[in-house]
Every structure is written in structure tokens, then in C-alpha cells.
From Swiss-Prot:
Entry GO MF terms: ferredoxin-NADP+ reductase activity; flavin adenine dinucleotide binding; NADP binding
Subunit-structure text: Homodimer.
Pfam families: Pyr_redox_2
UniProt remark on cofactor binding: Binds 1 FAD per subunit.
EC numbers on record: 1.18.1.2
SUPFAM superfamilies (UniProt xref): FAD/NAD(P)-binding domain
Reactions mediated catalytically: 2 reduced [2Fe-2S]-[ferredoxin] + NADP(+) + H(+) = 2 oxidized [2Fe-2S]-[ferredoxin] + NADPH
Family assignment from sequence similarity: Belongs to the ferredoxin--NADP reductase type 2 family.
Key words, A-Z: FAD, Flavoprotein, NADP, Oxidoreductase
Name assigned to this protein: Ferredoxin--NADP reductase 1
Cofactor: FAD
Length: 328
């Protein structure tokens, strides 16, 4: 089975495929596994995954990666699943942007919202200092200890980063181009207590010494008055978009950016399944939850196992009865 997507649902599907004695190949367009857990909110706590009263998103991702690797799958990151072709013997060939070509009987699409691409301001110096002081998310809170931080944005993520970093940073300043915030009211009130906030302000320029950020120029978008701030880091948190690449051209039945599946997680293409945030399941409310995606992944893998081997059972039993698989 080829699993497209290395986020939490793809990782769990990889584990479950191994549990069902299926060889798995994971293809992910990001440069690391973990999906949104590591790309968007690694330092935030996830509360709605069974068995964890609360766990850092990054830690949950690492646990899922460890679990996924239990049955030694092949993993290819920073690689797009670009095209699929049907063969005369009813197999699929998946071609990637790196020249890879993989033949498989089944495909599970767990691509989430697609490759996550941060929205950029294109301010002067922004690209030059990307990853040298300009960031679009917070991977590790400790990287910002003792630093003077400027956050750009007015949504939940921007406000949450201000609250998260204020205990460890030397200072936190947040600018927003309006005076109304698209964040939880309570969080906004807390932010004003721990950060310096400039409303009606935007980022004009990021300055540095060539290797790191040293200053940011902001301006009042009503008066055009400029201020130069001494900063060590600029976090631009104005949203992101998901890129599905050429997947939209594969002939899948889609509703908007979602792939339509039935109760068995089957798409309209034989041997192709989907699970997680990317699916729109017929007759079922869409819940964009990790917990929901886990169940969908298990169903998809189990149905795919039966498709590969008609003599196989859809339900192979409980993992607690499979100690031999885990004690090798």
C-alpha cells in the first residue's frame, strides 16, 4: 500500500498496515513527518486524543512516527505524489516529482489539507532572513528564550504565540493591521497584559546583519508614521494554505478540496482510499479531528487488505491478542 501523507492519519495508517502484514510506502511533500502537528502548532497542547489528558503536538507526532516505524515502512519525505496511472493488470503506478515510480494495488490518501504553505507578506527583507530570524510558526519554544520578538497577525495563532512565548522571551510585541482581532476574546485580553500591542500597524521591512535579524520597521497604516524596533525574531502569523498539487487532476470525485468517500473509505477509483481531513464521507458529518481520522484510517486499511486478498478478514482481531507481532 502506498500512503500519501505523513501527518497523524497517514502515520497511524502506516502502523495499521504493518499490523495487517501489508508493506507500506509513505510519500509526504513536507520536509518532515508529522503534518500540521509539527508544521503549524508543535508547541500547543492537544487534548482530544484518547489516552492523553494533554500532550504537546510535537510529542504526539514523535509518538506516531515511532509507532509507524514499528513495521519498517519505506518513507519518502519532501516528495510530491504527482501522478497516478492505471495499468492493464489493475495496479496503480504513482509517479513523484523526484522521478520515483511505485507500483501498488492500493493507495490511501491521507494528505490532510495538502502541503502546508505559509502566507507571506513579501515585506522587504522577509525572504532574505527566512529561518534567520523570520519564521512562520514556532517549532520549539526554547529557541525564543530571552529574545525580543515581533509577531505579525491578529488571529488565534498570532495571539496564542504571544501568550506562549511571553514567559520565556525578553519581550513580545504584536502588530495587527486592524483594531479587531480574529481570536478568542479571553486570549486577546490576556495578550494585552503580557505583550506590547500596536493596532493599525503593518510590517514594512526586516533588517539584519546578513546572518540574523536585528530590527523591524513597522508603520501605522492610517498615518504612515514609521517605527523601528530592535528585535531578534519576527513571527509572521497571517495564515497558511494547503496545496494538493496535481491530485485534483487524478479523476477523484471531489467536493471542493475534499475527496468523496463511502462508508468503507473507498473513493470512486478502484483500490484508492482516503481518510482524515481530506475526506467528505457520504452521510456522515465532517469532524476534522485526529480521533476521527484514526478510525477512518483503520477502516481504509482493513478494507484495502480485503481488496488485496479476498480471503482475508476485514477485522483481524485486537492488537492485545497479537503479542507475537510486537515481540520480534
Amino acid at each position: 500500500m502506498v500512503i500519501i501523507g505523513g501527518g497523524p492519519i497517514g502515520l497511524y495508517a502506516t502502523f495499521y498496515a504493518g499490523l495487517r502484514d501489508m508493506r507500506a510506502l509513505v510519500i509526504d511533500a513536507q520536509d518532515e513527518l508529522g503534518g500540521q502537528l509539527v508544521t503549524l502548532y508543535p508547541e500547543k497542547v492537544v487534548y482530544d486524543v484518547g489516552g492523553y489528558p494533554g500532550i504537546l503536538a510535537y510529542d504526539l507526532a514523535q509518538n506516531l512516527i515511532e509507532q509507524a516505524k514499528m513495521f519498517s515502512p519505506d518513507i519518502r519525505i519532501n516528495e510530491w505524489a504527482d501522478m497516478i496511472e492505471r495499468t492493464p493488470d489493475n495496479m496503480w503506478i504513482i509517479k513523484t516529482d523526484k522521478g520515483g515510480a511505485f507500483k501498488t494495488k492500493t493507495i490511501l490518501i491521507a494528505a490532510g489539507i495538502g502541503k502546508i504553505i505559509p502566507s507571506r507578506l513579501n515585506a522587504k527583507g522577509e525572504i532574505e532572513y527566512e529561518n534567520k530570524g523570520v519564521y512562520y510558526t514556532v517549532r520549539r519554544k526554547r529557541d525564543f528564550e530571552g529574545k525580543r520578538i515581533l509577531i505579525v497577525g491578529g488571529g488565534d495563532s498570532a495571539v496564542d504565540w504571544a501568550l506562549t512565548l511571553s514567559p520565556v522571551a525578553k519581550s513580545v510585541t504584536l502588530i495587527h493591521r486592524r483594531d479587531q482581532f480574529r481570536a478568542h476574546e479571553r486570549s486577546v485580553k490576556q495578550m494585552f497584559q503580557v505583550a506590547t500591542v500596536y493596532t493599525w500597524h503593518e510590517l514594512k521591512e526586516v533588517k539584519g546583519d546578513g546572518s540574523k535579524v536585528t530590527q523591524a520597521v513597522i508603520f501605522d497604516n492610517r498615518t504612515k508614521e514609521e517605527k523601528t524596533l530592535d528585535v531578534d525574531a519576527v513571527i509572521i502569523s497571517i495564515g497558511h494554505k494547503g496545496d494538493l498539487g496535481n491530485m485534483v487532476k487524478w479523476g477523484l470525485n471531489m467536493k471542493g478540496r475534499s475527496i468523496t468517500v463511502n462508508g468503507k473509505m473507498e473513493t470512486n477509483l478502484a483500490g484508492v482510499y482516503a481518510a482524515g481531513d481530506i475526506v467528505e464521507q457520504e452521510g456522515t458529518p465532517k469532524l476534522a479531528l485526529i480521533a476521527t481520522g484514526f478510525a477512518q484510517a483503520a477502516i481504509a486499511v482493513s478494507v484495502a487488505k480485503k481488496y488485496i486478498d479476498p480471503n482475508a478478514s476485514v477485522f483481524a482481531g485486537h492488537s492485545s491478542e497479537m503479542d507475537n507481532k510486537f515481540k520480534k
